[in-house]
A protein has these predicted regions:
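Conserved hydrophobic/aromatic pocket- or pore-lining residues that grip, position, or stack substrates
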Residues: 34, 51, 83
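Short beta-strand scaffold segments in enzyme catalytic cores
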Residues: 50-59
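Short, basic/aromatic recognition patches
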Residues: 19-46
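Active-site/ligand-binding-proximal alpha/beta "capping" segment
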Residues: 179-185
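Alpha-helix N-cap and coil->helix boundary residues
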Residues: 45, 49-50, 166
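Short, contiguous pre-domain boundary segments
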Residues: 8-21
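Zn2+-dependent cytidine deaminase-like catalytic core
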Residues: 64-173
Length: 185
């Protein structure tokens, strides 16, 4: 029998991991949340070492995501994809910046090729990245897939600003912890 629906969830602990009423005004606070989510996901054994959060123009939290690929047996359950989905469901729009102005995505690590593409379609205007793709591959053993040689330039052409290396050392530590455990799928 073919399945007629897909049901993806965040782990129960995720609601205790952040203050939904907090003001995440600066980029460091946004990135800190993404890295915290990635670390908690590893600590709880609820998925891979990745966290992401979507923020409104005012710095308010719209949605979060953590990697849930293994628990849900689906390759699309990356942290960024989960953050997009929870945010899109919350605001009931597939293009997050359609009516709200500039939207920011903070990620614990550079998006893989799938999440990179989804960032364009989800309506992201700013992308805050912690660890680099080479960190993900060397420390945790993941294959991030093919990205355009000038991936930053491609995003810039679409009006998406990229800021890298925010809390990179903290994000790298989470990846290294996960990599040492040998849990790469």
């Amino acid at each position: 029998m073919l399945y007629a629906q897909v049901h993806l969830t965040l782990p129960a602990w995720v609601h205790e991991a952040f203050d939904a009423s907090a003001d995440y005004a600066d980029d460091d606070a946004k990135r800190a949340l993404a890295v915290r989510l990635s670390a908690l996901n590893v600590q709880h054994g609820s998925g891979g070492p990745f966290g992401a959060a979507v923020f409104s123009p005012e710095g308010r939290l719209v949605g979060v995501g953590v990697n849930r690929v293994v628990p849900h047996s689906t390759s699309i359950a990356h942290a960024e994809m989960m953050a997009f989905a929870t945010s899109q469901q919350r605001v009931q729009q597939f293009r997050l910046n359609a009516e709200r102005g500039p939207i920011t995505l903070a990620t614990s690590s550079q998006p893989c090729c799938m999440c990179y593409g989804a960032s364009v379609w989800a309506g992201i205007d700013r992308l805050l990245i912690g660890a680099r793709a080479e960190d993900v591959e060397s420390l945790a053993g993941f294959d991030e897939g093919p990205l355009p040689a000038d991936w930053r330039g491609e995003l810039a052409q679409r009006g998406i600003t990229v800021v890298t290396d925010l809390r990179r050392d903290e994000a790298r530590a989470v990846l290294a912890e996960y990599g040492r455990a040998g849990k790469v799928y």
